[in-house]
């Protein structure tokens, strides 16, 4: 049987994020729903959904680093 483990994969700037990415915000792992930037591209609004389905928006500067998480499969012996 295979187990899925959530692991830290990388730190990304807001412009590297994609919808569906799993990121860490305030000790919670959330899913990116939408990403928008201001006219200058210096401030990004990242709309995200938590495990309870609640949607919130977090703002980041263009050079902030955001922890990206991914699921990996582990074979159980």
Regions found by a protein language model. Give the residues of each.
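Mixed-charge, Lys/Arg-rich low-complexity intrinsically disordered regions
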Residues: 1-18
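Generic cytosolic/nucleocytoplasmic N-terminal low-complexity/intrinsically disordered segments
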Residues: 1-2, 23, 49
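Generic preference for hydrophobic/aromatic residues in regular secondary structure cores
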Residues: 9, 18, 41, 63-70
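Residue-level "contact hotspot" at macromolecular interaction interfaces
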Residues: 16, 22-23, 37
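Residue-level marker for the onset of beta-strands and adjacent loop->beta junctions
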Residues: 18-19, 56
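Basic/aromatic-rich interaction segments and small domains that mediate binding to polyanionic partners
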Residues: 29-60
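Intrinsically disordered, low-complexity, charged/polar segments
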Residues: 55-77
């Amino acid at each position: 049987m295979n187990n899925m483990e959530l692991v830290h994969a990388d730190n990304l700037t807001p412009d590297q994020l994609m919808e569906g990415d799993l990121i860490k915000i305030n000790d919670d792992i959330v899913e990116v729903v939408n990403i928008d930037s201001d006219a200058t591209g210096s401030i990004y609004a990242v709309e995200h959904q938590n495990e309870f389905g609640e949607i919130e928006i977090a703002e980041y500067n263009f050079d902030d680093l955001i922890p990206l998480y991914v699921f990996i499969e582990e074979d159980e012996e």
